Amino acid sequence: ESRGLGDVYKRQVIYIDDSDVVKPDGYKFEALGLVRDGSKSTASKTVYEKGYHVTEACVLTKNNHPVSIFSKIHSSKEKNFTSNNDVTFSAMERGAALFGKATFAMDRGYDDNKMFLKLDELQQDYVIRLTAKRKLFFHGKWVPATQLRNQRKGKIKTTLTYKGQKHEACLSHVKVQITASKKDIYLVLVYGITEHPMMLATNKKIKSKEDVVNIALTYFSRWRIEEYFRCKKQMFQFENFRVRKLAAINALNFYITLCMAFLAHMSMKSETHALKAAIMQKADPIKEKVQFSYYRLAKGISGILSYAKEGIRLWFRTKRPSYRQLCLKLTA
């Protein structure tokens, strides 16, 4: 199975991220908890609303479009709930089972010793952005990662895309150790993009400048999973469900995931493919080419299906009832 997936997906990089489903006016939903509302929160202010956590793991297709391999809506109010980490571990185990060995790209929210230890246990590679609180073992003592960051300057110049804009960045790296097990890793530093240089921890081997650049590119391609969440919420009205049971909510999420997978399938088709050409014609996009085509594909499919007033029942052959004529068996 993993061999077949390797043929479809561009690189065996798995992106894990958390999102939220907010139901501020909900009262009857099962196990409704409090979540951080990402649309209202800022760097200086955190807003909490009633809702659910969503943990998603995605991979990229050959044309750089995300496909989900794990998606779960969960809440700390559930009876058998243990921790958010356990849900994340399930996503990691799913990725390891599908691909054998992959690279996990994760944001600062996953800078946790438990995450590093779990990935080491599964024998997986990772690229995880570190927080300012992280301490690393360097030259026989524990030092703040920010201290190592401030002592260095980027020597490797490259162009990186961040939040839709291209930036000239400088990269540097240093060999350090992490967690109580003191595993050897590399700290990759990215200067020139954010106010404070980014700190990326990776256990991937670095033998050349190209390896350093590839590690940075792996992390910065994370924006596609964030766009995946936005597309789910906008095109499928993800937060507008009415079912109350958590199992039913996850069932709806599963069907949306299938729809998103179909969009990924169509995005890989040639521009001359008859169905894709019809979808694009109906979508009537303003821009000829975009990096993320799910929106226009979903719009085109929605436009085509808007003509289907009778549903799908007319596509099936009608079963005619058997003749109800009275039959008499004649005997000689």
Where are these regions (language model features)?
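An internal, acidic/charged active-site-proximal segment
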Residues: 72-189, 275-286, 311-314, 325-332
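Electropositive, glycine- and tryptophan-enriched low-complexity nucleic-acid-binding patches
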Residues: 38-101, 185-199, 203
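Charge-biased C-terminal accessory regions appended to nucleic-acid-, cytoskeletal NTPase
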Residues: 291-332
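Extended, non-catalytic structural segments that build the interaction scaffolds
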Residues: 197-222
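Basic, amphipathic alpha-helical segments enriched in Lys/Arg and hydrophobic/aromatic residues
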Residues: 241-270, 283-285
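Single conserved hydrophobic/aromatic residue that forms the stacking wall/gate
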Residues: 1-9
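Short amphipathic alpha-helical "interface-anchor" segments enriched in bulky aromatics
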Residues: 214-242
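Short, conserved catalytic/metal-binding motifs centered on acidic residues
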Residues: 13-21, 57, 103-111, 126, ...
